[in-house]
């Protein structure tokens, strides 16, 4: 027998360890010994004395041992708190946030359960409560009344607790139970979460399974009892629920039976990390599946939001702007009221509004409105040169009263240099929000990592083509929702319910379908050319589903081929916009200026009434109300007529001319400034040193030819030296860059004209300015010299190779050909050098 002796103040603590049973005893002075039962949790007097000396408490919460007298009874109340069966149990948050867990509240609850008002236990006093929040229960110490025994009090408390718990509406979940504590519980707050299995450590001879069952069954249904074996030296009792295991552990732990002390603790359930193991053992499957789930989750969350914002982009329902349908209605109401008063006073505002368009444009506007109302697969292609007013005709005059218009500018998409910029521009055009361009770089890195780990790509990263296609797909769903917003599958017709299909509804209500306007649709581009194909396919799908009207605005005929590929069996409604005739241009300019001077005259008259010293500009009242001479002088009208000849009928140029005249410039002055501005643009874009020498020389040669004649035939250009190598490529590049426009006959280039009428005057301006012409002609001749010199070098290399052959008679014809070519190019170089000398002499003479 072994013993540990600790002398302290005349007392000795002995721990006697028998073969199977440990006995705690304290040796007192005079050789007396106090033996403590093995089932009692005991703290040595030395520890208690040190606690008292340090001023620390010896409560059960701090020491883990509950102290009670023989007149007190200890019970355990279950289900007072939520059990911490796991660290992420949401019931714990409910416990903390929504339930009153103060000490007074818990004591009041225990009192009501043990001694309710309708069945009180007289003389019963609640001495202390020790919460065990991890287990969801409370240890309560009661003072036993003198007229009751402990057994009677325990029975009455158990019965009262059972009865009181049944009164709750959620009694199945919140039912509390009370059990007398038979052992000596150890109050610990270690990180040992409850489980349904209890481990029983026997300090002494082991009990039988029957004894274990009899002792533990009262706390809950037992699924199985596992006796000790070679690998596990202790009993294990598995309960069906947490309640049974928790109550058994807190009520039985520390009990002594047949000189055997039972110590209970929860089985530490080691849960397998299924997710971690799945990722480690099945990486090639787990990572793609994870990314797929994340993608699905993102679609479920963000796609409805994006559809909502696309709808707002089209309808402007919640946008504070004049495109908002409610503000439009208010504006129309106000305009109609004002128009009524104006008509009453003899002022027709509808006539003034139509002055902004000439007669042909009004007819085309009416045709476009009629096509939208016909509702027969509306697929409209409007073609016209740059500046012909396509956008103004469609957006400002035809669709300005519609509440469901989506405008897409292809130029902003095509000119996006980076993928992130492209996606942002595309999202802005469609109203696609939210968008996360930065995710692309992240997914690319992840894709590389996954490829390095698994040997295959995850498929998470997407190209900008696929992302743009997804944007269009989401936009299609939003367009369909707008078109079918007021659709009802069943309507009441004369008391009968009539079923209506979606197709029939859309066919009968063309105004419900949104209008998609795709501007600057060229069909080909150096970068991001996929945009044209995707937009064409998307528009074709919209038209085939009959959920939208689609209008394409283009400058070239190349768009026809792209659209024909997307809709091979569809007949396009084509509208061609050309420059206005001189008469229509004159009427447009005069009507704009008459309206401006009419308003200015009214303001001047009002100012004259307010300040008599001022004089209003005279009004020629002898002319009719609609006669421009009533407001404009004949001299001004003559200057306008003279300016319109070089200005032409291009809409944007006419508008710019009108603005300049309104701001006070004379017509001749406004025209000269516009010509000078156009010539500067031509010089910077086509004739600067930064441009390819060959292209710059080709541009100047055409400028020289077109300044003399309004048009040049293509067959006259083919045989010129600068165009001889690739005539069509050179002409088409200049056309795409906006210097010239080319007409075609059955697909073959025919006539070459300036890009717009004003350019011919700009060409003439460049030719007539002697100093500028000298610089440009000198630069042109130098570029021709460089071009011919390069050709001669190439031919000389071939001659050098042929000169090494002994019998040169075999290549006499080739040698003669190369000789003639070199002679011709040399003559061209000599001619250019002579011209440069002549230009230099003329320049010097002008300076003198």
Swiss-Prot record:
Taxon lineage: Eukaryota, Fungi, Dikarya, Ascomycota, Saccharomycotina
Task of the protein: Plays a role in maintaining the mitochondrial genome and in controlling the mtDNA escape. Involved in the regulation of mtDNA nucleotide structure and number. May have a dispensable role in early maturation of pre-rRNA.
Ranges of the Mitochondrial intermembrane topological domain: 306-848
Biased composition (Basic and acidic residues): 613-627
Zinc recorded as keyword: no
Protein name per UniProt: Mitochondrial escape protein 2
Matches recorded under InterPro entries: Mt_escape_2_C, Nucleotide-bd_a/b_plait_sf, P-loop_NTPase, RBD_domain_sf, RRM_dom, Yme2_C, Yme2_RRM
Domain of life of the source: Eukaryota
Segments forming domain RRM: 196-269
One GO CC term, this protein: mitochondrial inner membrane
Subcellular location: Mitochondrion inner membrane
Side of membrane Mitochondrial matrix, spans: 43-284
Transmembrane segments: 285-305
């Amino acid at each position: 027998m072994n013993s540990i002796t600790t002398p302290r103040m005349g007392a000795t603590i002995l721990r006697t360890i028998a073969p199977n049973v440990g006995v705690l005893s304290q040796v007192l002075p005079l050789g007396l010994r106090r033996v403590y039962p093995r089932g009692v949790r005991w703290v040595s007097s030395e520890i208690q004395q040190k606690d008292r000396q340090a001023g620390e408490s010896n409560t059960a919460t701090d020491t883990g041992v509950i102290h009670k007298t023989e007149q007190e009874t200890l019970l355990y109340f279950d289900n007072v708190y939520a059990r911490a069966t796991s660290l992420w149990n949401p019931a714990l948050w409910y416990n903390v946030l929504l339930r009153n867990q103060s000490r007074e509240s818990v004591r009041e609850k225990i009192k009501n359960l043990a001694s309710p008002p309708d069945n009180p236990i007289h003389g019963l006093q609640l001495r202390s409560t020790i919460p065990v929040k991890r287990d969801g229960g409370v240890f309560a110490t009661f003072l036993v009344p003198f007229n009751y025994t402990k057994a009677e009090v325990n029975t009455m408390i158990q019965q009262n607790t059972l009865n009181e718990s049944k009164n709750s509406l959620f009694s199945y979940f919140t039912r509390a139970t009370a059990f007398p504590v038979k052992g000596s519980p150890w109050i610990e707050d270690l990180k040992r979460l409850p489980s349904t299995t209890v481990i029983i450590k026997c300090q002494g001879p082991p009990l039988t399974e029957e004894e274990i069952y009899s002792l533990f069954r009262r706390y809950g249904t037992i699924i199985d009892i596992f006796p000790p074996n070679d690998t596990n030296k202790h009993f294990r009792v598995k309960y069906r629920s947490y309640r049974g295991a928790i109550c058994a552990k807190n009520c039985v732990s520390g009990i002594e039976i047949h000189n055997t002390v039972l110590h209970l603790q929860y089985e530490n359930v080691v849960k397998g990390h299924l997710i971690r193991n799945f990722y480690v053992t099945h990486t090639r499957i787990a990572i793609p599946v994870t990314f797929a789930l994340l993608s699905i989750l993102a679609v479920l969350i963000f796609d409805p939001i994006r559809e909502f914002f696309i709808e707002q982009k089209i309808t402007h329902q919640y946008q504070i702007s004049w495109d908002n349908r409610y503000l439009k209605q208010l504006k129309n109401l106000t305009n109609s009221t004002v128009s009524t008063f104006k008509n009453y006073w003899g002022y027709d505002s509808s006539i003034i509004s139509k002055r902004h368009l000439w007669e042909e444009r009004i007819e085309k506007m009416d045709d476009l409105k009629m096509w939208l109302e016909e509702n027969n697969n509306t697929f409209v292609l409007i073609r016209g040169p740059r500046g012909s007013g396509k956008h103004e005709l469609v957006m400002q005059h035809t669709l300005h009263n519609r509440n469901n218009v989506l405008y897409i500018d292809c130029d902003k998409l095509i000119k996006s240099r980076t993928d992130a910029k492209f996606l942002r521009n595309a999202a802005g055009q469609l109203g696609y929000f939210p968008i996360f361009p930065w995710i692309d770089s992240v997914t690319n890195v992840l894709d590389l990592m996954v490829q390095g780990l698994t040997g295959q790509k995850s498929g998470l990263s997407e190209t900008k083509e696929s992302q743009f296609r997804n944007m269009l797909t989401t936009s299609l769903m939003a367009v369909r929702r707008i078109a079918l917003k007021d659709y009802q599958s069943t309507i009441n017709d004369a008391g009968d319910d009539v079923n209506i299909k979606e197709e029939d509804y859309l066919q009968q209500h063309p105004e419900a379908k949104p209008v998609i306007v795709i501007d600057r649709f060229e069909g080909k581009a150096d970068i991001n050319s996929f945009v044209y194909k995707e937009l064409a396919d998307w528009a074709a799908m919209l038209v085939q589903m009959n959920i939208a009207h689609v209008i394409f605005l283009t400058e070239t005929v190349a768009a026809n081929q792209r659209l024909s590929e997307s809709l091979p069996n569809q007949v396009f409604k084509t509208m061609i916009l050309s420059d206005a005739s001189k008469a229509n241009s004159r009427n447009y300019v005069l009507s704009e200026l008459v309206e401006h001077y009419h308003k200015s005259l009214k303001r001047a008259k009002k100012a004259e009434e307010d300040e008599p010293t001022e004089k209003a500009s005279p009004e020629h009242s002898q002319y009719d109300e609609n006669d421009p001479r009533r407001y404009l002088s004949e001299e001004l009208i003559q200057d306008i007529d003279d300016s319109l000849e070089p200005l032409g009928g291009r809409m944007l140029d006419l508008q710019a001319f009108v603005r300049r005249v309104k701001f006070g410039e004379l017509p001749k002055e406004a025209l000269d400034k516009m010509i000078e501005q156009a010539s500067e643009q031509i010089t910077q874009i086509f004739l600067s040193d930064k441009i390819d020498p060959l292209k710059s020389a080709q541009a100047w040669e055409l400028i020289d030819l077109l300044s003399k004649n309004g048009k040049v035939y293509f067959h006259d250009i083919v045989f010129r030296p600068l165009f001889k190598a690739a005539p069509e490529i050179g002409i088409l590049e200049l056309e795409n860059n906006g210097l010239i426009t080319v007409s075609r006959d059955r697909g073959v280039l025919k006539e070459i004209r300036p890009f717009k009428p004003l350019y011919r005057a700009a060409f003439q301006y460049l030719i007539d300015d002697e100093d500028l012409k000298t610089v440009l002609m000198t630069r042109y001749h130098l570029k021709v010299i460089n071009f011919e010199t390069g050709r001669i070098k190439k031919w000389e290399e071939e001659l050098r190779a042929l000169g090494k052959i002994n019998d040169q008679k075999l290549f006499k014809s080739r040698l003669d050909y190369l000789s003639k070519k070199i002679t011709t190019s040399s003559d061209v170089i000599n001619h250019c050098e002579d011209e440069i000398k002549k230009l230099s002499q003329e320049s010097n003479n002008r300076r003198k």
